[in-house]
Amino acid sequence: MEKYELLKDIGSGNFGVARLMRNRETKELVAMKYIPRGLKIDENVAREIINHRSLRHPNIIRFKEVVLTPTHLAIVMEYAAGGELFDRICSAGRFSEDESRYFFQQLICGVSYCHFMQICHRDLKLENTLLDGSPAPRLKICDFGYSKSSLLHSKPKSTVGTPAYIAPEVLSRREYDGKMADVWSCGVTLYVMLVGAYPFEDPDDPKNFRKTIGRIVSIQYKIPEYVHISQDCRQLLSRIFVANPAKRITIREIRNHPWFMKNLPRELTEAAQAKYYKKDNSARTFSDQTVDEIMKIVQEAKTPPPSSTPVAGFGWTEEEEQEDGKNPDDDEGDRDEEEGEEGDSEDEYTKQVKQAHASCDLQKS
């Protein structure tokens, strides 16, 4: 860890803490996500790292390496100085149609590349889209903790993601197409940018997950009268918010949609993007670590630290997190563990989903 020096903490969540670090030699700023050694280092962590490592696209946060400390596994990534798109929305209230399109175009290009690489993200949302520090911000998709590769993993069937962004078929507990669920989440992201609110939440009762679920499965949303957007934009949203994923617009169709094509930056055109889609297995990733090297480090990280004594600069121990009022197992109630191999813990949202199933409130497809 002599390679990096600590600058400041930049976030915390279910995984632990994230810190802004600087490479002592190159002076490059990086973000480091610290995960406590031991039980938290599971198949999901390995999946996140391996999936993320395989991706090389300007609209995806670059994975650099993993580092083992005495107390934590640290994932080293590109630092996005512009912060979360969520914070930008909170500051602005909502975006104009043109600004919303600018970010949506980048989001779709990043997701399209993920899908080409046979990886579905499964937790796309404003909080998982970062911005670089440039005057015309470049959007960067991050957090592949729920991602699945169709080449490496089974077809998803568990209810994961964030309630406001979740697609109807994900609630069914049956197998579903993760790529089409990503399309739905992209639509929710677009709606929030345009309106400044979530499409399927009751504004008077936003924490009522049961009501949100009901609105999702019945496609109950509307665009407020005070939001003036084009007919093309409305039509695109209506093609995304379709309950049957087989009838939902695809990423390919979105990229050819008139609203999406308008004012499309040159670097996002299909001709410019083609270089990222070359099937060249010898192409370098952003990481110098091989998969075998990474898996060896991850395996070693499964061994808990010998003691809970904090080590300066190596992240917080769980005791420190709890003293600061941060329960490492809490992440604002927006995460649900994978069933079976990924745990049996339930949050309030999961309970609401199960209650809805039990009372036949969910429409089975």
Swiss-Prot record:
Gene Ontology biological process: abscisic acid-activated signaling pathway; protein phosphorylation
Q: Which residues form the active site?
A: D123
Question: For the region Disordered, what residue ranges are annotated?
Answer: 298-365
- Report whether Transferase shows up as a keyword of the record: yes
- Which reactions appear under catalytic activity for this entry? L-seryl-[protein] + ATP = O-phospho-L-seryl-[protein] + ADP + H(+); L-threonyl-[protein] + ATP = O-phospho-L-threonyl-[protein] + ADP + H(+)
Listed EC numbers = 2.7.11.1
Residues recorded as binding ATP, renumbered to this chain, are: I10, G11, S12, G13, N14, F15, G16, V17, A18, K33
What are the Protein kinase domain coordinates in residue numbering? 4-260
Regions of compositional bias (Acidic residues) in chain numbering: 317-347
Please describe the post-translational modifications of this protein: May be phosphorylated.
Question: Is Signal found in the keyword set?
Answer: no
What the entry lists under Pfam families is as follows: Pkinase
What is the tissue specificity?
Answer: Expressed in leaf blades and leaf sheaths. Expressed in shoots and roots of young seedlings.
Similarity comment: family membership: Belongs to the protein kinase superfamily. Ser/Thr protein kinase family.
Its function? May play a role in signal transduction of hyperosmotic response. Can phosphorylate ABI5 in vitro. Can phosphorylate BZIP46 in vitro.
Q: What is this protein called?
A: Serine/threonine-protein kinase SAPK6
